[in-house]
Each structure stands twice: as C-alpha cells, then as structure tokens.
C-alpha cells in the first residue's frame, strides 16, 4: 500500500536480525559504516567541488588550505553524528514520520542556529553546523573564525560513545 509507506518500516530490526543471524546492534553499526563511508566521500567531494568552483569563477584571494581542511573535517564529523542519530531514531521509533520530522526540524536548527545562544548550539548535532561556520562578513571584510575543534571532538566522542552504547543495548533486547 503506497499510502502507508512513510509510516511503517518494511522490516523490523529484530526480525531482520533473527533471520540473518546478526545481532541488531551489529546491523545498526554495519548500516552506519556503509552509509558513513558514503557520507564521508560525498562530504569530501563537496568540499573539493566548492574549491574547484571558486577557481573556475576566478576567485583570486589566497586559499586558506589548513582552515578549509579543518572545516571539511568538522563538517564530516557533524554529518556522521547526524547520521548516527537518525539511524538510532529510525530503529527506536516505529513511525518513520517521526524520524523524518526530526530531520526536518534539524535542518531548520542548522540553518538558523547562528541566531541561537552558543550553548544551545551544542544541544543537538545540527547546532554544530552553525558552530562550524568557517567565516563571515563583518561589514565588507571577510573574517575567518577559529573553528571549534574541541566542541567538534566532543561531539565525536560523545556521539560515538552513545551510538556504541545504544547499539550494544540493542543486542540485549528481546526480539
């Protein structure tokens, strides 16, 4: 039934786990690894394409390579944290419209996070997109910001630890 597509999953994690012989937590981690590789690759390609586009249109200002690499790495960590969160949410909530809705709210948090107080940006993975802004204009001058490497590292450690903890607990749940 086409109308029920977004609200029901076609396969329950525990049913899939039971038929495949792989634990639910391992399935989540495998999904993260496969999708994470794609997300990481696309993030690097996007970064390279932006640099190439700047050269193509004739941007002549000096290229801040180390700053750009740091920014790309930061965005990759944030993208992977969002991916991990969305994978867990999709598994834990039966109605997939909830996961979709949370993702849409996250997009708005990412877009408008710059107007939030800094501490609020740290409360969701999407808030980190605003924290990782590499530069902005002050008047007519382009000003580069110091990237929040410590905050991004914290997101990686806390997000990764929570993902491992939750997926490990999936293995102890009854089917």
Task: Please state what every model-predicted region is.
Residues 16-24:
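Short helix-to-coil transition segments within interhelical loops
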Residues 2-10:
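Short, small-residue-biased leader/transition segments that mark boundaries at the very start
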Residues 100, 105-175:
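Terminal transmembrane helical anchor/hairpin motif
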Residues 12-14, 88, 126-128:
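Tryptophan-centric aromatic hotspots in well-structured domains and transmembrane helices
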């Amino acid at each position: 039934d086409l109308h029920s597509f977004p609200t029901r999953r076609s396969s329950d994690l525990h049913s899939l786990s039971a038929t495949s012989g792989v634990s639910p937590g391992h399935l989540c981690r495998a999904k993260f690894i496969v999708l994470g590789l794609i997300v990481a690759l696309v993030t690097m390609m996007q970064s390279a394409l932006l640099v190439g586009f700047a050269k193509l249109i004739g941007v002549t200002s000096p290229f801040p390579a180390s700053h750009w690499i740091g920014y790309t790495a930061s965005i990759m960590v944030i993208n992977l944290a969002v991916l991990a969160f969305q994978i867990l949410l999709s598994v834990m909530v039966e109605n997939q419209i909830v996961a979709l809705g949370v993702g849409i709210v996250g997009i708005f948090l990412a877009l408008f996070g710059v107007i939030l107080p800094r501490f609020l940006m740290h409360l969701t993975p999407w808030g980190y997109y605003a924290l990782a802004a590499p530069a902005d204009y002050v008047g007519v001058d382009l000003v580069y910001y110091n990237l929040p490497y410590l905050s991004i590292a914290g997101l990686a450690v806390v997000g990764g630890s929570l993902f491992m903890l939750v997926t490990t607990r999936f293995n102890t749940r009854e089917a």
